[in-house]
């Protein structure tokens, strides 16, 4: 199984799909998230008003959680927190990134502990998303989750969505997903229904559990990571399992 390069992953968002292990960078088969909701969702950019090239989640007033491809493919210079749009400064907050660090146990070859934290120049006014419990009790096989991003809405030749999109996906048990992909405990799989998926301009974006009636109850359970194809029946997307990184996250966010 070959992990395509980060540059190639971005290229395939507009060209022919890579049939191999593909970094997931789009949302399709879903719908538009209402403006002014899910405002913990962050777009990672190289300029304040430029296009979002990766997704992330505000997990403290001064930290955005994403995946390592988002710190390696391009330099993350700004995040747009609370925005509904792919680019521009018409809403949300555009905040400068002052540092980026990958998980201390990140293994590029196996894909374990694929997490990165961006530290912001100033606190965001938006409310961070809740982190899951470290005991993994917030994830149950068969539960429904939601992935979000600004990626293309059709595959393979779609264009990026100007508005934030979301799609509902069923969570798989790891032993079930292990029959399809070689994954470990730091991953979680979701999806597998035809035409509904995360795929090839929003890696690092959130997979959430909607735990109540409002966004304040949402729990961040995963980060868009990789998979084979897009929206194929029986082929889910692999997400970084956030519960396995809570100790590291807390050590960074509380130490700064």
UniProtKB/Swiss-Prot annotation:
It is found in: Secreted. Forms an apoplastic complex with host endoglucanases in tomato leaves during P.infestans infection. Disulfide bonds join 54-70, 177-189, 199-230. CDD domains: Tryp_SPc. Belongs to the peptidase S1 family. GO terms for molecular function: serine-type endopeptidase activity. Residues 1-15 form the signal peptide. This is Glucanase inhibitor protein 2. It comes from Phytophthora infestans (Potato late blight agent). Keywords: Disulfide bond, Glycoprotein, Secreted, Signal, Virulence. One of its GO terms (biological process) is proteolysis. It comes from the Eukaryota. InterPro entries: Peptidase_S1, Peptidase_S1_PA, Peptidase_S1_PA_chymotrypsin, Peptidase_S1A, Trypsin_dom. The keyword Disulfide bond applies. SMART domains: Tryp_SPc. The keyword Signal applies. GO terms for cellular component: extracellular region. Residues 27-254 form the Peptidase S1 domain. The lineage of its organism: Eukaryota, Sar, Stramenopiles, Oomycota, Peronosporales. Its main location: secreted. It holds the Pfam family Trypsin. Secreted effector that suppresses host plant glucan elicitor-mediated defense responses. Targets host endoglucanases and inhibits the endoglucanase-mediated release of elicitor-active glucan oligosaccharides from P.infestans cell walls. Glycans are attached at residues 87, 102, 107, 157.
């Amino acid at each position: 199984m070959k992990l395509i390069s980060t540059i190639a992953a971005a290229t395939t968002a507009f060209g022919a799909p890579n049939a191999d292990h593909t970094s997931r960078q789009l949302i399709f088969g879903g719908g538009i998230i209402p403006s002014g909701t899910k405002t913990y969702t962050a777009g990672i950019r190289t300029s304040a008003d430029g296009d979002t090239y990766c997704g992330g989640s505000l997990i403290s007033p001064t930290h955005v959680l994403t995946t390592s491809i988002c710190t390696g493919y391009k330099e993350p210079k700004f995040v747009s927190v609370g925005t509904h749009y792919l680019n521009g400064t018409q809403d949300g907050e555009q905040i400068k990134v002052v540092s980026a660090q990958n998980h201390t146990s990140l293994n590029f070859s196996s894909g374990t502990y694929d997490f990165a934290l961006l530290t912001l120049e100033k606190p965001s006014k938006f409310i961070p998303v809740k982190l899951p419990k470290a005991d993994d009790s917030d994830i149950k096989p068969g539960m429904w989750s939601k992935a979000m991003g600004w990626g293309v809405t059709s595959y393979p030749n779609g264009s990026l969505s100007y508005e934030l999109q979301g799609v509902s996906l069923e969570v798989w048990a790891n032993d079930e997903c292990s029959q399809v992909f070689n994954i470990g405990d730091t991953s979680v799989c979701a999806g597998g229904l035809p035409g509904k998926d995360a795929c090839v301009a929003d890696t690092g974006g959130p997979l959430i559990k909607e735990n109540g009636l409002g966004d304040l109850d949402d729990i961040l359970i995963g980060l868009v990571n990789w998979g084979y194809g897009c929206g194929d029946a029986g082929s889910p997307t692999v997400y970084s399992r956030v519960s396995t990184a809570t100790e590291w996250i807390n050590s960074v966010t509380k130490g700064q």
